[in-house]
């Protein structure tokens, strides 16, 4: 029994030594992948539209002005501002079309061609577009 216990200890010690050598070898354990922050999606009946890197739809508010959001307080609860910096964009999108503004509530928000971008709180899954056309002022963003 004592020999079995010593063998288990030896195996554990060797395991720790080997894992320490592998981790300290300077070689990455997993390769880092740059996440795309913005991409183009397509949906039947909707066409092409912008989404975040996870496929969540992005919207624009027709009452906004270039580089100025008018969706504040309660509005921003239902339509959370989208923000990513830097805006890593998918091939086919122009990085220069995206910028960041500081809102009146001091939060930062990403813009597309000057128009602030938003999520819709009732979109729960990638590809949901439930906010499109709400109040005739909210629309998906088309590239």
Report the location of each language-model feature:
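Bacterial N-terminal signal peptides
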Residues: 11-21
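Compact beta-sheet-dominated domain cores in extracellular/mature segments
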Residues: 26-143
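Bacterial N-terminal signal peptides that target proteins for export
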Residues: 2-12
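Short, low-complexity, intrinsically disordered N-terminal modules
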Residues: 4, 22, 26-29
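A subset of signal/propeptide-processing and intrinsically disordered low-complexity segments
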Residues: 1-2, 47
């Amino acid at each position: 029994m004592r020999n079995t216990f010593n063998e288990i200890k030896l195996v554990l010690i060797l395991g720790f030594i080997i894992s320490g050598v592998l981790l300290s070898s300077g070689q990455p354990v997993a390769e880092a992948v740059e996440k795309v922050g913005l991409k183009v999606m397509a949906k039947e009946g909707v066409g092409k539209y912008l989404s975040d890197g996870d496929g969540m739809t992005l919207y624009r508010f027709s009452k906004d002005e270039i580089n100025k959001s008018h969706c504040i307080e309660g509005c921003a609860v239902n339509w959370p501002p989208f923000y990513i910096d830097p805006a890593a964009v998918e091939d086919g999108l122009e990085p220069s079309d995206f910028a960041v503004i500081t809102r009146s509530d001091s939060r930062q928000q990403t813009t597309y061609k000057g128009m602030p971008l938003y999520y819709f709180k009732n979109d729960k899954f990638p590809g949901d577009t439930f906010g499109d056309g709400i109040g005739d002022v909210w629309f998906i963003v088309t590239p």
